[in-house]
Regions:
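Terminal, basic amphipathic appendages of nucleotide-handling enzymes
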Residues: 2-75
């Protein structure tokens, strides 16, 4: 499944910016907080859309989507 997440802002406890697409085998729902790989290392992301059709992903990125690591720990 492909989902869209917005990333946690550096040093803050809120999420924003443009959505990024990730692949996952996890059963996610909108609002879940997950651990995502980014160019700067791991970060938390908030799921804003699930079941994104592959056709909606820019063809340049379809074969290189990163995968969500896991659910974020609670707390």
């Amino acid at each position: 499944m492909i989902c869209n997440v917005i990333l946690r802002k550096s040093g803050e406890n809120n999420y924003g910016g443009r959505p990024y697409s990730y692949e996952t085998d996890l059963e996610l729902k909108v609002g879940d907080i997950v651990v995502c790989p980014t160019v700067s290392g791991l970060n938390y992301g908030k799921v804003v859309r699930v079941d994104v059709p592959r056709e909606e992903i820019d063809p340049r990125w379809r074969g290189s989507l990163r995968e969500i690591v896991d659910f974020a720990p609670e707390g």
